[in-house]
Design a protein with these regions (language model features):
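Extended soluble regions of mature proteins
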Residues: 21-271
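Bacterial Sec-dependent N-terminal signal peptides
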Residues: 1-28, 271
Length: 271
């Protein structure tokens, strides 16, 4: 009987060790839809093309998801870019944040380190999975067979009209994911998770994330550390701060209306 207990203990220990050792690194590339409108007495189609191209390059980013069965870290890969020469008197430089998204599936929580308007925040909250609708469709992404899942909701945004007025827009949104049961973890890039396999592709109509490389059980053990720097807030508190700051910026823009000599470039990210 004692021998049986010892064997059972060893088997349990080995099983736990195997489960904990499963880990990997997935690389994703992003593309974002940009709706560009130019409000000017002398609309310049060539300038519009140049802005569109600069924005396209700015939004092409690379991210890594480092994961094990219980935790993950998702962050943008830093890369050195040669300075872009100003064209037609302008150059676009979009500030790319150093966001780090930590998810703990076992404890059902996440921590998101993010920066807005020069201030660092640490968003801590409970994971809130969407009610995904599993669809009987498949496709291959690299060497993996992926299955489709969709989620429908509404998104509300504030924007400035061509007249400089603040407009609130609510529109339907469909998010489509592709996940593979061949990598049996319920995780994915950014805030996405909750499907029976690693999520390899995301498309919400504006943003597309596609996995381009996966390393399972790399030789060097992966490091997953929860971020700790920043002002700690909940997700709701952060969104309230973000909305307030965005509204303040739009109001400042409104106050300068009429002093832009009739030339204004309006860039809307998304549809």
């Amino acid at each position: 009987m004692k021998i049986n207990y010892v064997c059972f203990f060893l088997l349990l220990t080995i099983s736990n060790a195997i489960a904990q050792e499963f880990q990997g690194i997935a690389t994703y590339k992003s593309h974002r839809k940009v709706d560009l409108k130019i409000s000017s007495e002398n609309e310049n189609s060539e300038m519009k093309k140049q802005i569109q191209e600069q924005l396209r390059k700015q939004f092409q980013q690379e991210y890594t998801l480092t994961f094990n069965r219980n935790e993950s870290i998702y962050k943008r890969e830093e890369k050195l870019q040669a300075p872009q020469p100003a064209q037609s008197g302008f150059r676009i430089q979009i500030a790319q944040g150093s966001d780090i998204m930590y998810k703990n599936m076992k404890e059902n929580r996440y921590t998101n380190k993010t920066e807005i308007f020069g201030k660092l925040f640490l968003i801590k909250d409970t994971l809130n999975n969407r009610q995904w609708q599993l669809v009987n469709e498949t496709k291959n992404i690299g060497d993996y067979t992926c299955f489709k899942a969709v989620f429908n909701d509404e998104i509300t945004t504030q924007t400035l009209t061509e007249e400089g007025e603040i407009e609130t827009i609510t529109k339907p949104r469909t998010t489509t994911l592709w996940y593979t049961p061949q990598i049996p973890i319920n995780n994915g890039p950014a805030e996405y998770y909750g499907l029976p396999g690693l999520i390899l592709e995301v498309n919400d109509g504006d943003l597309t994330l596609v996995c381009t490389k996966i390393i399972i059980n790399p030789e060097e053990r992966v490091s997953i550390e929860e971020p700790t720097k920043g002002k700690e807030v909940s997700q709701v508190e952060f969104e309230e701060i973000q909305d307030k700051k965005s509204k303040e910026m739009m109001e400042q823009y409104q106050s300068r209306k009429g002093n832009d000599d009739g030339n204004r470039v309006m860039i809307r990210i998304g549809g």
